[in-house]
Amino acid sequence: MLRRPWLPIALALFTACASSDPKSTTGTFDPELEKQEQGKLDSEAARNEFHAVLLQMDQALDSYVRAVSNSGIARYDTEREQLDRLLRQLVSGKPAGSTTDKLVALAGDSADTYRQGIALAALGFADRSDAMSVILQGAQLEDEQLVDRAVLGLAILRDPRTPPGVIARVVENEKHNERGRIGAAWALVHLQENSLRADEILPVWLHILEGDKDQHPLLLANALRGLGFTRNAKHAAIVAKYTSHPTPRVRMNAAIALGRMNAQDQYESLLTMLGPGETTPNVRLAARKALQQLAGNVDRGYDVALWRREFQRGK
């Protein structure tokens, strides 16, 4: 008769099961354990959702910066307005302010600098009185990328109380990356007309424009814009030097600045920009508009002789 070797194995398994702890097989429902596990799942889902929102903010911020850099072009101006609304909604969250609270906490957390940078820039769209002080701390960190993100946030926020000196240090720091310095110069221009301390910004523009003319054209262009916004013809001679700069954007901003300053003594510099030597249409148009401002809205088109007669008649 054949033996059945499975019998002792089955008996051994049965014995092992019978001798095990009965609690492990009872299937007793533990509501507290389920609550803990559900809490873990909810927390993980919330973290994933917030991370997705951060990524959306980051992409929107990049698009916003691109749109701002192309200001004056209709489709980019429209895009900027749309992105502004989107980012304000994302930063606020649902319920209102809930995402802002998370961003404030994240802005001071250096454990993940990528997320921290997004928070510092995005808080520029926050509707909270304490946002400026939070972003300002980021602008004084040692990490250049975080500083650049924070400067962007301060520019967007446009809080009149923002200390210009923090951003000015970035502009004037030649060891800082060039793109960051240009961004900081743009930020100062953006803050200038709304600032309670605009007098602290003027020396920055003078330092740039009285320095090396071979500096990055965008740095010079922002300095010219800023000096133009002072609407003070006292520094018009400094601006006039840049009407012959090799970069069209610099020449254009020099012309616009002279118009805003109502720099009557510099009309000859503007007339030169109307002549055959100037081949960039936008520069010629800027010079023409500046001459109109100097002449009390009189327009002589692109006729240099008529413009010269207009200004000589007024003497």
Locate predicted features.
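Bacterial N-terminal signal peptides that target proteins for export
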Residues: M1-L7
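Bacterial Sec signal peptide processing site at the extreme N-terminus
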Residues: C17-E34
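Terminal, low-structured helical/coil segments at or just beyond the last alpha-helical repeat
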Residues: K289-K315
